[in-house]
Amino acid sequence: MKNPFAHLAEPLDAAQPGKRFFNLNKLEDSRYGRLPFSIRVLLEAAVRNCDEFLVKKNDIENILNWNVMQHKNIEVPFKPARVILQDFTGVPAVVDFAAMRDAVKKLGGNPEKINPVCPADLVIDHSIQVDFNRRADSLQKNQDLEFERNKERFEFLKWGSQAFCNMRIIPPGSGIIHQVNLEYLARVVFDQDGCYYPDSLVGTDSHTTMIDGLGVLGWGVGGIEAEAVMLGQPISMVLPQVIGYKLMGKPHPLVTSTDIVLTITKHLRQVGVVGKFVEFFGPGVAQLSIADRATIANMCPEYGATAAFFPVDEVSIAYLLQTGREEDKVKHIQKYLQAVGMFRDFNDTSQDPDFTQVVELDLKTVVPCCSGPKRPQDKVAVSEMKKDFESCLGAKQGFKGFQVAPDRHNDRKTFLYSNSEFTLAHGSVVIAAITSCTNTSNPSVMLGAGLLAKKAVEAGLSVKPYIKTSLSPGSGVVTYYLRESGVMPYLSQLGFDVVGYGCMTCIGNSGPLPEPVVEAITQGDLVAVGVLSGNRNFEGRVHPNTRANYLASPPLVIAYAIAGTVRIDFEKEPLGVNAQGRQVFLKDIWPTRDEIQAVERQHVIPGMFKEVYQKIETVNKSWNALAAPSEKLYAWNPKSTYIKSPPFFESLTLDLQPPKSIVDAYVLLNLGDSVTTDHISPAGNIARNSPAARYLTNRGLTPREFNSYGSRRGNDAIMARGTFANIRLLNKFLNKQAPQTVHLPSGETLDVFDAAERYQQAGLPLIVLAGKEYGSGSSRDWAAKGPFLLGIKAVLAESYERIHRSNLVGMGVIPLEYLPGETADSLGLTGRERYTINIPEDLKPRMTVQIKLDTGKTFQAVMRFDTDVELTYFHNGGILNYMIRKMAQ
């Protein structure tokens, strides 16, 4: 059907009549000018894609009427301009696409219909690990090992880039997905098929929101949802409320963008922004560079919002030119955004739109800080760090507690390393990593770290040799300007050599610690510390042996590495003593903002970005040499332990089955609050005594060849065994941290997978009980696929993180939510009952259903299918089944 809004299309430039745009001002609707800028992007996409089938005129009216409809839980469709994927989530997506082609063929359809219609970029950044550090050849050795471990995955991805249209792969060694997106992939405005429209995207990584800092609306979705978008489906979303976050004032000269984002993260967690957009405005925004804004937008998942949007302004335009974008294109970007009312002047209050609620932060109140020891929202001022850590030591086990007996607070353990004796204590730093796109995309904090390293070396300071130090930049541009500015040798001297271009320590690919260090930590039962410039510090994520992990700016990472402990008050205690016996304090070596800006102006230049990115797809010789099959259907290798055809579609037919009630289900796990997707489906190392390790050992692999769970996401047998395999999982059935549960019929304590397998063999359905914020953290589709394969039919929780809830829906697992004010405790649930959940045939969004226990007790819960589209997916047994049936008909 013809687009009913076709009359809004007009040329942007009289000289190019063939290039048009949808002029939303021609709607002649006064409501448009009051909409938040982020909502204007949703409106434009709806107007441009209106076909009265997937996108209806009524959807446009609902978005225009945002001021009223934001409170009505109304569903709207959104068709993003593109999709980005990283390899940990990209491999299972390509595996699903390959399996969907097989399924469509089996059902009599054309398998080549399974093809991305929406452009997709897949950046390989999650596979490299810090195996080598503190040596000049660390980068080469880590990259060689990455290829050795992942050759099969990389060959499969190369097959995918040839077998599917519209899919571009950025090879390993290029950088981190979100930084490459910011510096290179982002268009800001698309110029395609004779039409200008705003760049927008979804990504299979929760930190996709980083691009919001450049004025490109984007957020993380589950891999399952991203696959549907790639196949042309719109995302069905609840029209979000938009929190206006007003920034005022100017930051103190000693404050970094990291300090600002950690302050905002704590603030917005307290405000409560889950499921909402945050849009930044106010004169303080004009004080922030695009790198600063991107740092703030990057940590959006940590404060729980869907998106953290900074509209495009003059600073954004200057950034596009600085990063080597073509001048003519940048002119058209500005002209288009001005024509359509999406270009901002943050000092002009008349441009401030309506918001659901306004919260404010005066940037001059921000102080240097870290976050930890177990959550990104737990901000600690650097001046309070020593006191805070010491109070955490004795506090009850929890987010801010390790329950170490008072008489053990000063325990020490000596050990030999490289023929010298060293001592570890509670609070000793054993990992110090400058890592993550959150910070390595920001030249001011990276050059700040480099200048601090220079001053530290010149002052005679050093880092103890057993501390695992590393520098993993998000793109080659970082190395370029660190080298050109002359600070790289000083970073290397302190142990911060470049170890790889990828996520590395930030996602738990921190590699092994020296054996003597691990022995000292375990024998002394010490709370050892990791300090990283990342965005997440959940328990067990950074490294199994660092029970405390703090997020900090790159200069502070170096400072704590030099100090060797977090039990230091930088204002009163020296970092160290130089060869002359003089005490050196942090204030003596901290670079000024003027020093940093002078170096940045001189060395961060457009030519550098052009040089790095013009050869990004061809620079990796190992990638270029990979052979990949050319067939359109993938030839699965039954012996492969990396790539396996998943069982999701084996019994799929064209006929729909009515939904069945869940009868007499057992509880597999009884969990508490803030269970992350890391707890549900860890990405890190495969423990040697785990079900996944036994599977690999039975296939002839040695522990050295296990690789990580993240790298094995193309193999469902390993991922099912890795579900709930996090050593920090706290299950109320056991009252201890372990990847285990009680098999209720027998009373035996088993690994979670072994217990689930026993239930499945007996034909017994399973559910999971949980508390608040279930599924927070990474947008990990295996955190939904894994439970599905374990036979889990439903999860009953107090609340869900947005992406994980939609992933459960996408796999046909029911997300149930207690009624307001009710919890497992208030209802007296022990988890040892059997649960019957009545599922009516005439399901409606957010319907209340009855749950009956074998004790005779009944209560109600809300079925969190939030939209009609989600119900359609559930009736089909999941979103991919729905797509296959659609393509096969």
From Swiss-Prot:
Catalytic reaction equation(s): citrate = D-threo-isocitrate
List of residues binding substrate: Q86, D205, S206, H207, R536, R541, R699, S779, R780
Chain's role: Bifunctional iron sensor that switches between 2 activities depending on iron availability. Iron deprivation, promotes its mRNA binding activity through which it regulates the expression of genes involved in iron uptake, sequestration and utilization. Binds to iron-responsive elements (IRES) in the untranslated region of target mRNAs preventing for instance the translation of ferritin and aminolevulinic acid synthase and stabilizing the transferrin receptor mRNA.
EC number: 4.2.1.3
GO cellular component, one term: Golgi apparatus
Organism: Mus musculus (Mouse)
Pfam families linked to this entry: Aconitase, Aconitase_C
Major localization listed first in the record, in broad terms: cytoplasm
Gene that this sequence comes from: Aco1
Cellular location(s): Cytoplasm, Cytosol
Required cofactor names: [4Fe-4S] cluster
Binding site for [4Fe-4S] cluster: C437, C503, C506
One record GO biological process: post-embryonic development
Name this protein carries in UniProt: Cytoplasmic aconitate hydratase
Cofactor stoichiometry and binding remark: Binds 1 [4Fe-4S] cluster per subunit.
InterPro entries the UniProt entry points to: AcnA_IRP_Swivel, Acnase/IPM_dHydase_lsu_aba_1/3, Acoase/IPM_deHydtase_lsu_aba, Aconitase/3IPM_dehydase_swvl, Aconitase/IRP2, Aconitase_4Fe-4S_BS, Aconitase_4Fe-4S_dom, AconitaseA/IPMdHydase_ssu_swvl
Keyword terms, alphabetized: 4Fe-4S, Cytoplasm, Iron, Iron-sulfur, Lyase, Metal-binding, RNA-binding, Tricarboxylic acid cycle
CDD domains: AcnA_IRP, AcnA_IRP_Swivel
Family label: Belongs to the aconitase/IPM isomerase family.
GO molecular function terms listed in the Swiss-Prot or TrEMBL record: 3 iron, 4 sulfur cluster binding; 4 iron, 4 sulfur cluster binding; aconitate hydratase activity; iron-responsive element binding; metal ion binding
Quaternary structure and interacting proteins, as annotated: Interacts (when associated with the 4Fe-4S) with FBXL5. Interacts with frataxin(81-210).
Class of enzymatic activity (EC top level): lyase
